[in-house]
A protein has these predicted regions:
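Short secondary-structure junctions
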Residues: 60-63, 218-226, 270-275
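Structured alpha/beta or helical-core interaction and ligand-binding surfaces enriched in interleaved
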Residues: 227, 252, 261-265, 270-276, ...
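Hydrophobic helix-cap positions at the C-terminus of alpha-helices
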Residues: 85-86, 143-146, 218-221, 265-269
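Inter-lobe coupling/hinge segments of SF2-like helicase ATPases
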Residues: 1-198, 203-208, 245-248, 252-253
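Short amphipathic alpha-helices in soluble, non-transmembrane regions
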Residues: 210-216, 257-267
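Short, intrinsically disordered low-complexity segments
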Residues: 229-255
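A carboxyl-terminal module marker
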Residues: 216, 220, 225-239, 278, ...
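A short, structural micro-pattern
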Residues: 146, 191, 240, 272-274
Length: 288
């Protein structure tokens, strides 16, 4: 089921027994039957922190545990209390998201389990392997900080992926060599600058037309680099606002040429009566 306001999939949350949009906060009750086919045999799947909490409770009934994620951490004082309890060994098992993967120093962690370690590889972002390697390395670094040797278990469907293998082997240099080789081959940073244009507005047809007009104009003005046709953004709609994006790969040293052309088009857009907003992001950190 998708959010009627944002157009993205809703996420089930056990604490409200309902569906929740992480972009706009829209909530819906858990459906009794499928809204498409009418079948009532609905089954919850996935390996989120709430599901892990259920499994921990079932498998380790004699151990104490706590969960730390965005849902629990936003409550005042919860994060400090949970971490203090774990540090004092009053809590045996700490379940969490990336919140607990870095920046924490406990001398009593003997085992770290990284669930679905390859899930970040599926994000449409050229930095996905780097972020996967970074996350595994940081999470693994929580184990074995005291006198006892730590152990790390990585769950993955892609054990042969170079980012997963390098992280498991603590091979930073090997990962870096392969990552830079692929980025050079695909004309990604640091060999090229990446410029992302984001077009947004409340009329999808107008947003798509404006993006197409910019694409045509840029191709007439510039004859170097790579200018890709605009497409709906991975998250195409947020809070009733439609979003398209266009990617440009700019050779190093030619950024000024592209920025000059974009500045000209942006001034023309500001002087027009169009209701489409245009954002320009150089070497963006997110492509969502």
């Amino acid at each position: 089921m998708k959010c009627p306001v944002c157009g993205i999939s809703l996420t089930y949350h056990k604490d409200i027994n309902g569906l929740y949009c992480h972009f706009c906060g829209h909530k819906e009750p858990m459906p009794i039957k499928c809204p498409e086919c009418g079948q009532s045999a609905l089954r919850l799947q996935g390996a989120g922190t709430q599901k892990l909490e259920e499994e921990i409770e079932r498998l380790f009934p004699d151990n104490t545990y706590a969960r730390l994620d965005l849902d629990t951490a936003k409550r005042v004082g919860v994060m400090d209390r949970v971490l203090a309890s774990f540090a004092k060994r009053k809590t045996d098992i700490l379940i969490g998201t990336q919140l607990i993967a870095k920046g924490l120093d406990f001398d009593n962690v003997g085992l770290v389990g990284i669930i679905s370690a390859d899930s970040s590889l599926n994000i449409p972002d050229f930095r996905a392997p780097e972020r996967t390697f970074q996350l595994i390395t940081q999470a693994a670094g929580r184990a074995g900080r005291g006198d006892l040797r730590g152990r790390v278990i990585i769950q993955t469907y892609s054990p042969d992926n170079y980012a997963i293998k390098a992280a498991a082997e603590h091979d930073y240099e090997g990962f870096c060599r392969e990552e830079l080789r692929l980025r050079k081959l695909m004309s990604y940073p640091p060999y090229y600058d990446l410029i992302r244009l984001i077009f947004s507005g409340d009329d999808e047809k107008q947003v798509a037309k404006e993006a197409g007009d910019w694409y045509e104009s840029l191709n007439e003005m510039i004859h170097t680099g790579f200018i890709y046709r605009p497409q709906p953004a991975p998250v195409n709609k947020i809070k009733e606002t439609y979003r398209y994006h266009m990617m440009i790969k700019c050779p190093r040293g030619r950024r000024g040429l592209f920025l000059g052309a974009l500045d000209k088009l942006n001034r023309e857009n500001n002087n027009s009566k169009t209701r489409v907003n245009v954002g320009i992001d150089i070497n963006p950190y997110s492509f969502i």
